Amino acid sequence: MTLRSRLSGEAPQLWLLLLLASTASSLWASVAARTGPLHDKVVVCYVSTWAVYRPEQGAYAIENFDPNLCTHVVYAFAGLDITQAAIKSLDPWQDLKEEYGKGGYEKMTGLKRSHPHLKVSLAIGGWNEGSANYSTLVANNLLRGRFVKQVSSFIRKYNFDGLDLDWEYPTQRKGKPADRENFVLLTKELREEFDEHGLLLTSAIGASKKVIDEAYDVRQISRYLDYLHIMCYDYHGSWDRRVGYNAPLTAPADDPLSVKFSIDYLLKLGAPPEKLVMGLPFYGRTFKTLASGFLNDVSEGVGFKGPYTREDGFLGYNEICQTLSNQTSGWTREWDPQTSQVLAKSERNVFTQEINVVTYDSSRSIANKVLFAMSKRLAGVMVWSVDTDDFLGNCKLDEDTYEDFQKVTAAPKRSSQNYPLLRTINEATMLAVDELAVPEPQPDDSENEIPHGSIADRKNAGASMVSLGLGVTAVFMLLHRLAQ
């Protein structure tokens, strides 16, 4: 055989080798470029944007946010201009770039360029917005229609992926009985508009039985919402005038104030599990008492405030863990296995005779709740809010996080100490698969659509990684055979 004929015979093989090498390179690049959690569950992270104004180490800017720990982030909050039936920024200097503002909207949505897995929504409402204006809006067909078009345009103008409705709550706090039905109309009309542009539609949902019964037609709103973010916290606080747990996982059978009751009740009312996102608090509720500082002790007035959040009756997890980390502070803590809650209390003040108490979720609480959410086949969990996690990593990590997991002998090693609660969520989500050892069911789509931008486009990310790995292996095996 001549040299020329030999080369011409090898040319197709050479081109095939080059093609396969290019394919292998692309596959490895896909693996390397993956961002976000290494599981297929939803982790929704609310950011309270006023946290930027907190003092010292409590100040939280968008630059502090770690997009790899969340699948969705919700920028909280925008407000309602009822005179225009329009969404509006509540802090133009912080949110917008106009008038030399800081451009918070653009900074948050800009994270998608380097983290393509991330979905960024804008929340409208919140506790301070109240309910009256939203009640007026949804009761009027003209106002409702104007709002639907304007909010769709606003969301797209600032490059958000969707809207989170945080009306607290329909029919409550100067709302009207008709709000329950009118809220369904609002979600339906937003769904129709948002489908034209591929936008997400979610809503924060109250967790108490009273609010659920009076405010929501659960089965109907589930048809139009991609996800229902259940606010499974604030079950108890200083407003009760006695010490209580902020977010107990379970409670006595006749007590509806628990996470388990809220989730089970919503499922009973027809909420699809693949649309339910269970809320986890990155904060505790505080109390002052003249008694001994135990559960159900009578409390005095509003709870004490922290140095960063500076809110009566409220303490961020970062404030709690720093307080408890001080060995000379005189604080003690006690774990309640029935509720997966921690109660911590100070020494008695010699002047006021009061004891300060805080009830909160530790890493162990979070892990147990994630396990519960996975056992119920929920879409995932959400957090309020990432800015009160120990985002700087100032505190020592808990050593009992997986104490209640049967198949975990040691906590996974972490590369970083920051965001201990958020990292626990992602660890526990993956560990729960082995703990429960039950195959995932296929969602029932007979009545509810596949969530937009959620289940359909995040189907088993772990399996995708395995497929990529197998693809790369196959390519290199073929390359090896051709080279022989």
UniProtKB/Swiss-Prot annotation:
* Protein's organism: Drosophila melanogaster
> Which terms in the Gene Ontology molecular function aspect does this entry carry?
chitin binding; chitinase activity; endochitinase activity
Phylogenetic classification of the source organism? Eukaryota, Metazoa, Ecdysozoa, Arthropoda, Hexapoda
Going by the entry's taxonomy, the superkingdom of the source organism is recorded as: Eukaryota
- The name this protein carries in UniProt is Probable chitinase 2
Q: SUPFAM superfamilies, per this entry?
A: (Trans)glycosidases (SSF51445), Chitinase insertion domain (SSF54556)
Q: Which residues bind chitin?
A: E98, E99, G125, G126, W127, N128, Y169, M231, C232, Y233, D234, W384
EC class, as a word, reads hydrolase
Q: Which reaction does it catalyse?
A: Random endo-hydrolysis of N-acetyl-beta-D-glucosaminide (1->4)-beta-linkages in chitin and chitodextrins
Q: Where is the signal peptide?
A: 1-33
* EC number(s) reported in the record: 3.2.1.14
Gene3D superfamilies named in the record: 3.10.50.10, Glycosidases (3.20.20.80)
